[in-house]
């Protein structure tokens, strides 16, 4: 009887969790910085287009992880008025802490900082986030936060519908003059701090029209019904400890940070910024972003992002190149791709192999569609783990020894390219909020398409069917053909097979 009563009491307590969310009326209103007066970033980045010039932006592709970090550091260090930062993941590791420190120093010199983080990956950051928020020029908000900070998983028992919807957006904007958006989160694996785990990813550094679009989009999310003040959610935190973390209290961590900073200062982009010689590409751009109400499953005034992305990329005439680390095409998506092939459109897909993926459940959702995709005539490639991709801007998606694919980019007819956070899976389409930019540029899209066509066969398995309709993986480096998932241990193959039997496709 006592056990039943305790269980009932625990359930009632858990059911009340969602009601513990603080009132949104306690938030202060703010909007992005806006001025036409010359500022430091205009000179540092040699900005040629104002944020209000319709559709025209200057972009610089960030395929190298060290350049990707250098760009972010440069924006923080050059900012005079505001920093608006929106991320799904911000890790408390070498790169994450270094950027946190630079942000704090920016606030010290008077820069207003708005930091919006999805709360799904902030475990262990509470002290540091409170320390940041304690600065009068920094405000931290959490998207769809967990009320229970220590026992977060319990929140899913009673608030699953809300907590299952995450903010997957990634943007990094300084003074409403320059922005970075694409696939990278903030963490060592995205910036090649160590060699054990490196993600092949892609961002753009941009000035011009797209910056204003990103700034207005950030304002929408900042004021959304899912964004809560961190101080109202984190009720127990140690601010002095968080300040110590910001100050590199650990000597080993401090030395690692200094070494990485030295590496960044040797990157080509860092030197280009110092010399005011960034080789910009002037292009037409269009921001594609979800309505933040998607985070609460509310009706949006905008069509789903997948529909708007398809409209922006337009109907293909010759070929489509799809790069998606998490690729779950679903039955309808597989049929749509097959129809393109039937109409004479070449379709190529690059995704992760089982051994390369960091989410085996997603791979299990994709695996069952491989045969239908291949039967329809789609070219299918799976990234090999631990393959050294060439380190120049003309080769591949990144310059590093890659352990996993994380870039999300789609190229249509060598004329239009999408770079952003959107994966070709049900979660991106229906559950998470996403964003990215469509770039109209035969020069950039065509070059990326040719580069992928030339280099992908050298670092990815070509998946085909043998004469008995069985899957096989061809490794061009060794000229070896595998009959099972290459390099994946038996237990991993079994786990993926079991996961494929579960009715979880809509969550992947």
Q: What residue ranges belong to the model's regions?
A:
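Bacterial N-terminal signal peptides
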Residues: 7-16
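Charged, low-complexity intrinsically disordered terminal segments
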Residues: 17-168, 174-508
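Bacterial N-terminal signal peptides that target proteins for export
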Residues: 1-6
